[in-house]
Amino acid sequence: LYLKDEFGVETRLLRPPGGCFTEEALKKAGELEYKYVLWSWETDARDWAGTSASVIASTIEKNMHGGDVILLHDSVVGKSHTAEALRILIPYLLSEGYSFDTVSGLFSEE
């Protein structure tokens, strides 16, 4: 509701911050017809912590499985190596037969 009120953007997707949620929060999300989205913990490359591009890429490469959702952050001022890691990861994952989709796209396929 905050996004709509503040920015005029409407969504029905909810990612619990840090992956932490309560049953009450899930119940309320369901009442509001939100779909909650969790990511694959094994692929958490901690890109938000200033991790190098090579470590981000290798963490995901080693731990990736079909159907995983990878959580990456678009920027952390002065510390983000995520874009550089994606230049490594995308060609590698495509060569391994993986494909990419948005979270909204995954839900629209249900």
Regions found by a protein language model. Give the residues of each.
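Short beta-strands and strand-loop turn motifs
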Residues: 38-42, 69-74
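Amphipathic, non-transmembrane alpha-helical secondary structure
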Residues: 1, 23, 53-65, 83-91
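Divalent metal-coordination and catalytic microenvironments
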Residues: 14-17, 36, 70, 93
